[in-house]
Amino acid sequence: MLPLKESVIESNKLDVDYHIALHTNAGGGSGSECYYYKDKAFASSVLNSFDSYHTFPKRGLKDGSHLYELKNITAKNKPLIEFLFHDNKTESKFIQNNYNLLAMSIVESFLKIK
C-alpha cells in the first residue's frame, strides 16, 4: 500500500483512464458511499453495483472535489468508494467475508462501459 501522495504520483505516471480508490470508512457510521470529481457516471455505476450486494444503508454519491486524491489524479474516471465502515462490527465482518463482492462490483462497472 502506497502513501497517498505516492499513489497519486504513480497513477499519474501511468497515464491511466481509470483510477479507483478503494477505501473503507470509519467514524461510527454505517453504509456505503462513493465520492466523485467531475465525472459521476462511473462512480455511480461502481456504487450501484456494490449496493446491490448488501442491505446496509446506501449513503449515495458525494462531491469529492475537496479530496486530495481526487483533485490531483489526472485520470478522467476516478471514483473513491467507501465500501462500508470497518469500525462497525457487522459491516467489518461483511467486508472480510465478502471481499470478492467488492471486486465484483468494480468488474461489473467496467463491463457496463460502452
Locate each region found by the language model.
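Catalytic-core regions of hydrolytic enzymes
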Residues: 1-41
